[in-house]
Amino acid sequence: MERFDAIIIGAGAAGMFCSALAGQAGRRVLLIDNGKKPGRKILMSGGGRCNFTNLYVEPGAYLSQNPHFCKSALARFTQWDFIDLVNKHGIAWHEKTLGQLFCDDSAQQIVDMLVDECEKGNVTFRLRSEVLSVAKDETGFTLELNGMTVGCEKLVIATGGLSMPGLGASPFGYKIAEQFGLNVLPTRAGLVPFTLHKPLLEELQVLAGVAVPSVITAENGTVFRENLLFTHRGLSGPAVLQISSYWQPGEFVSINLLPDVDLETFLNEQRNAHPDQSLKNTLAVHLPKRLVERLQQLGQIPDVSLKQLNVRDQQALISTLTDWRVQPNGTEGYRTAEVTLGGVDTNELSSRTMEARKVPGLYFIGEVMDVTGWLGGYNFQWAWSSAWACAQDLIAAKSS
């Protein structure tokens, strides 16, 4: 049986980065993945350009039942540290919006960078490999793979969550946690589009493809200012993806479709200047024409001129456009979700090393645990930071 200092399961962002760091410090590392190629989710991210971090990373941008857990790792390995690595590899990047950093060229550059870093650390890759069983003994862990048995002193689980099953997502990491007696919190899809109840969906389907700036608010008071997109299945766009992580089934969200307009002042000014202008054409100055026309067809916008718009109808219109209350039917689920909420309970782990408190030598990094970031590079930064924190402990174990 071949033995390694550390075996890392999952050749995604966290798994590759942790492997590279430990390998370059002299640890003998085996990196296992069930896919044909490493970094499959990286390649799909950011429209193929990988939103690899965010300039404004802070603990408040992460959801967890233990909101303090992420602070240590994020402080010890920051976005600036990862940007330095990207720069060292000569990868050109740009800020798109709200601090989101993307490769100028392709997400493949980030995968190639991580593979190169792993090669520098003499990391052994074993792809297309299924872990059939994991057992612990006095020397560490023994893993049965399809075709071989391997052993290690330290075992790192970096298998991610349940989002995007088409890219190989599975509950493997949760099962390992449960096998060793660790609590796993209920999971659900996060950063995911909303589906709508049939009557509302049928009313809005003709708007598929229409995008508008918005401010969207969850019942718990969380607010995001981002674009909203109407789709054939419901609502999407950055605003909806962000708020979906804070939404619970049965709840409403409030949507302001005119976040940059004081609608009452605008209507009064336009009435004074153009009293005979139709309300529809007036609103089309700030809203997509297709949206205005559809809302008028649905009776949400009166078919009147500005001088005919009475006070009661104006107030109702303002409420419709700035406090549109929508009760989603649900979400599109893990198939299109960018992340998984919940997972391995962080109270079971050391925030400094990511090691299981009750199982020495067993670590969890990245999305598999109950830490979920906002849209915009935050989840990649958690992968880098948690991987770095874990790697430091793997390195310290070797030196000691």
Predicted regions and their residues:
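Beta1/beta-strand and adjacent pyrophosphate-binding region of the FAD-binding site
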Residues: 2-14
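Glycine-rich active-site loop/strand segments that organize a redox cofactor
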Residues: 49-95
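Glycine-rich FAD pyrophosphate-binding loop
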Residues: 7, 23-47
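An anion/pyrophosphate-binding glycine-rich loop and adjacent beta-alpha core
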Residues: 36-38, 43-44, 52-59, 92, ...
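A glycine-rich dinucleotide-binding beta-alpha-beta segment and adjacent secondary-structure elements
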Residues: 127, 293-372
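Glycine-rich loop(s) and the adjacent beta-strand/alpha-helix scaffold that form part
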Residues: 154-200
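Feature captures the FAD/FMN-dependent oxidoreductase FAD-binding
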Residues: 76-154
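Short hydrophobic core segments
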Residues: 7-9, 131, 150-166, 177-178, ...
